[in-house]
Structures are given as C-alpha cells and as structure tokens.
Amino acid sequence: MKKSFIHQQEEISFVKNTFTQYLIAKLDVVEVQGPILSRVGDGMQDNLSGVENPVSVHVLNIPNATFEVVHSLAKWKRHTLARFGFNEGEGLVVNMKALRPDEDSLDQTHSVYVDQWDWEKVIPDGQRNLAYLKETVETIYKVIRLTELAVEARYDIEAVLPKKITFIHTEELVARYPDLTPKERENAITKEFDAVFLIGIGGVLPDGKPHDGRAPDYDDWTSESENGYHGLNGDILVWNEQLGTAFELFSMGIRVDEEALKRQVDITGDQERLQFDWHKSLLNGLFPLTIGGGIGQSRMAMFLLRKKHIGEVQTSVWPQEVRDTYDNIL
C-alpha cells in the first residue's frame, strides 16, 4: 500500500512540475506568489457565476475587515500586473489554491478544493481580438501535449491528444445540435474532434439561453468576435475515454475593457459592483488590457494519468460512499 501511494504521489508531482516548466517557458510568464484571502468590499473576489457563497474568515488582529477564501485570482492578477508595471506581452502565473464549498455536486470531476495554474498576460497593442485568443489557446494546448508526451515517455501511458485543437463558437454548436443540452453538445463535438476550444461562454445564444454562466467582470463574453458571433472567451475540452464524456481542462478569455464591463453588468443586473475599488480602477483606465485563465492542476493530472476520479490526484473531502466506491481516493 505504501509503495502504491508513493508512486501515485510521484506521478502527480511529475505532471504538475512538467506542466509548470513548459507553461512558464512557452507562455512567457513569471511564477509569483498569490493570496488565499480576499478582503470583502474591494471587488477583488471572483464571483464565478454569481451564486456561489465564499468561505468567510475573520482575522483577530484586523477587526474592522472581513475576508473570504478566494474562488480564483482572476481580478487579483490584473490588479497585480498594473501595480507592478508589467509591459505588453509580459505576464504571471500563480500556483493557486481555493475553496468552492457551493459546488453543485461532488463527483468524479468536481471538488470543493480547487488548485489551478492561474495566469494572466498583458495584451500587446492592437491584439485584443479573436486571433490573439486563438494564438494563446494554441500555445497552451501545445504545453498540454508536451506534458502528455513526457508522461507517455516516463510512465508508458499512451498519448491520445490530436496535434491540433478545433475551434468552434457556441452559436455554431447550437445550430449544429439544436435539440441537445449544452452538456450534450459538448459531448458530441468533443467526441468527434477529441480536443476543442469552445468560444463564447456567458452570453445568451439563439436558443434564448447562455451555454453556461460567467461573471460579468472578468471575461469579455459580449464583444463581437467574428461573423456575427460574440464572446472573446471559452473552455478547452478534451475527450476523456475513462469517463466517456467531454472533460473541461480550463477556462480562459480576453478580459473586459471599460465598455464590456458596463455592458455586462447591465445584462446581469450587477451594476452595484461598479462602486468597488477594483471596478473603479478599471473604468478609470488604470488596468492594462489582459488575457488570462485558470488551468486545473488536479484535472490535468487526472486526465494525463487516466484516473477515474479527481480524488485520486488531490486530497479533499468526500462523502463516505465516494471513498467506498473508489479504492485510490487520497
């Protein structure tokens, strides 16, 4: 049992260390330290889809403030790029840890404990567009493939990802599969192409519903991208043969500018957020134009090591029936 446990840990560390090295080199970002707590009221917390409740923390020696365990560092990263004067094309990545206790379900792919490579870059002048989004997606996808090939060489786990990733808009997906749910559409397109970047998540689609929810104040999901389609963000999905389903590795996007922020808070009814310090800074032009996202570390390890449950690659909390069902839960 000890030998198996140690081997399991070595595999996880190999995936994380290898991916980190490739990501820093290929994406040209610097690794920095990030916070676990966010001060309530400054607007820095990631509100995700807007319904999740964060973990509240009271610090004994800071009695006049309340803090929350971060959901992600989406807005902190942009603030930090501005604070320290990062230039166009430069960026950072954080080994982020977070808690999301309001996850809809604790299942094979969802945990209350979140670990991500949380990254952000300043967009070069004139490149706040779909072409730059796609270029960045292709760079990160190359990092995934390089890591998969390294895992294959070390552990004899066959590489399965295609050389190229397929891009498709959520509007195209609705037209292609009008009778399917968003999840069923993801399964259908990902099973066909094995690796897909789904563009435009958050805005209302021709069927009257968004593909999925997104907060209004980090990704730009309303600007026109091309051919009448909207959204400069998306998800990377791969086909997971172990689970027989599409598997989201991470979300990313070009971040809101002043106009997109105002437009999106009007759509979601979150205009009160514009009174927060973070949002005022953005509206006053104090933040650079950026692109960023969060790459799930445990999800990456789970996929590349062909595990059937995320609890096999991270230590979290689970109902007893999960531990009874899966032998290798950590």
UniProtKB/Swiss-Prot annotation:
EC number per UniProt: 6.3.1.1
Q: Which GO terms describe its cellular component?
A: cytosol
Please list the reactions this protein catalyses: L-aspartate + NH4(+) + ATP = L-asparagine + AMP + diphosphate + H(+)
Q: Known PROSITE patterns for this protein? A: AA_TRNA_LIGASE_II
Q: State the similarity comment.
A: Belongs to the class-II aminoacyl-tRNA synthetase family. AsnA subfamily.
Q: In which pathway does it act?
A: Amino-acid biosynthesis; L-asparagine biosynthesis; L-asparagine from L-aspartate (ammonia route): step 1/1
Please state where this protein is localized: Cytoplasm
Instruction: Write out the GO MF terms.
Output: aspartate-ammonia ligase activity; ATP binding; catalytic activity, acting on a protein; transferase activity
Tell me the protein's name: Aspartate--ammonia ligase
Identify the species of origin: Streptococcus equi subsp. equi (strain 4047)
